[in-house]
Amino acid sequence: MRAPEAAMVATGGGGPGLFTNSKPGDRKIVPDDVGDREVFKVVYVVLESQYQASLSTACKRINAGQPDVAVECSGYILEELRDEANFQQFKKDVEEANIFIGSLIFVQELADKVVSVVEPNRDRLSAVCVFPSMPAVMKLNKIGSFTMVRRAPR
């Protein structure tokens, strides 16, 4: 199986993502020919580049085959958030997003960065879906009426 773009799998030291030479902008998906479709924006943070491939494929399939909706998607490999320019772009993307997805965020300093950006936007976001990650990041989950935030008893 071949990867369609070398930047998606290139590895090496010292690049913008520490473990990858790709940039978040290289993975951004913007739908062509939106027409009358409703566009929603998704931002995700995953541990490694292979995890982002399925999210990118899903977005492309939605954009190609759904008559009523289209997806704009911005993706980040967790380690890319160490780079200040990437982190600032991540903040901007989350501020404009409808949905945030996070997976395998287990590095404390990076988990803290994700929380610092997503938490202030949580109530505005339509959904926040985080799975196996640090507890503070898991508490951001919000899908419909489901939330992992503990409410004070009445």
For each predicted feature, which ranges?
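An N-terminal assembly and electron-transfer interface module characteristic of large anaerobic redox
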Residues: 2-154
